[in-house]
Amino acid sequence: MSRIAKQPIVIPSDVSITLIGQMVIVKGSKGELKRLIHDSVLVKSVKSCLVFSSRINSSVKGWAQAGTARSLVNSMIHGVTVGFFKKLKLFGVGYRISINSSKNLNMSLGYSHIIEYVLPFGIFVESISQAEIIVKGINKQLVGQVAANLRAYRKSEPYKGKGIRYSNEIVRVKEAKKK
């Protein structure tokens, strides 16, 4: 049995949760998120809590899915109340990022051309400087995916450390080959 699935989620007062079959709809001050829960998971609303369990009590996979569903719904509640963000930093001579419009990023990353990145719906970018941005949104998975996509354009290389990296990422710089 999943230890995570056994813990109920306390629903905050400013969040409303609607259960329609296996669909969970979470509404909060920052927006609304929907997620379809696996068929082997039973979700119940008891007082001001959400309780997750397996439909088949002896099924190990059902309890594993219940733990996953509980974590996903908990992330949805956190997203619509507080939100998620990832901070990215650029290291390198001439590496710049600028916000063209509310949905476009222009990146100069040492290539012969400027890279344009169109932001998906629900993602917002805030520029701290030309070398630092913050990716914000209510969907944890989407914020992480956009940050990973931006980082993939120029990953930090191990010899000089140039590239895009997360703010908390530590890049170990290798020593150059000696003759």
UniProtKB/Swiss-Prot annotation:
One biological process GO term for this chain? cytoplasmic translation
Coiled coil region boundaries: none
Q: Which Gene3D superfamilies match?
A: Ribosomal protein L6, alpha-beta domain
Q: Cellular component per GO?
A: cytosolic large ribosomal subunit
Keyword annotations for this protein, in alphabetical order, are: Ribonucleoprotein, Ribosomal protein, RNA-binding, rRNA-binding
| Presence of the UniProt keyword Cytoplasm in the record | no
PROSITE patterns linked: RIBOSOMAL_L6_1
Q: Does the keyword RNA-binding apply?
A: yes
Q: Which GO terms describe its molecular function?
A: rRNA binding; structural constituent of ribosome
Q: Name one Pfam family in it.
A: Ribosomal_L6
Extract the SUPFAM superfamilies matched here. Answer: Ribosomal protein L6 (SSF56053)
Family note: Belongs to the universal ribosomal protein uL6 family.
Query: Subunit structure, briefly?
Result: Part of the 50S ribosomal subunit.
Q: What does this protein do?
A: This protein binds to the 23S rRNA, and is important in its secondary structure. It is located near the subunit interface in the base of the L7/L12 stalk, and near the tRNA binding site of the peptidyltransferase center.
Q: What is this protein called?
A: Large ribosomal subunit protein uL6
- The species is Buchnera aphidicola subsp. Baizongia pistaciae (strain Bp)
